[in-house]
Regions:
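PRPP-associated nucleotide enzymes
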Residues: 1-136
Length: 136
């Protein structure tokens, strides 16, 4: 499978690359023709920071963000995204004028939950959800 892999580079920054593997992949709800591996993008500091810069440019001038909820292990990107949005002067309604970066926990049924101590980061906030996994 690795020999079929190729990289797709962002036109905005060559540091941002996703590995793509063509094939037939089955999930419980869909069939897909390409697997997009974002492991290094979400784990390497320089790639995560570059990806965050690109993402921030889409939100910086027109979208208030109080909290970033990170799914699928993208907390590194989320932290850099919060930093980039803060640098750009994005509107944030939090008392400390900083963006929360958090991840939900899972209960025994696999449902995402926020415990009482982290609910203040999401309830009534302008939330940006950052995920590295989507499917049809």
């Amino acid at each position: 499978m690795e020999d079929r892999m190729y990289k797709v580079f962002s036109p905005n920054d060559s540091k941002v690359a996703m590995k793509v593997i063509p094939g037939h992949f089955v999930t419980t709800h869909s069939h897909i023709t390409h697997y997009v591996d974002m492991t290094t993008l979400r784990a390497r500091q320089n790639e995560a920071e570059a990806a965050a810069r690109i993402l921030a440019s889409k939100y910086a001038n027109n979208t208030p963000v109080d909290s970033i909820i990170c799914l699928n292990g993208c907390e590194v990107i989320g932290a850099y995204l919060a930093q980039e949005l803060t640098k750009s002067g994005i509107m944030c309604l939090n008392a400390h004028h900083t963006i929360y970066v958090t991840s939900p926990e899972q209960d025994i049924n696999g449902q995402m939950i926020f415990r009482d101590n982290s609910k203040i980061m999401v309830e009534g906030k302008n939330v940006l959800i950052l995920s590295t996994s989507i499917t049809t």
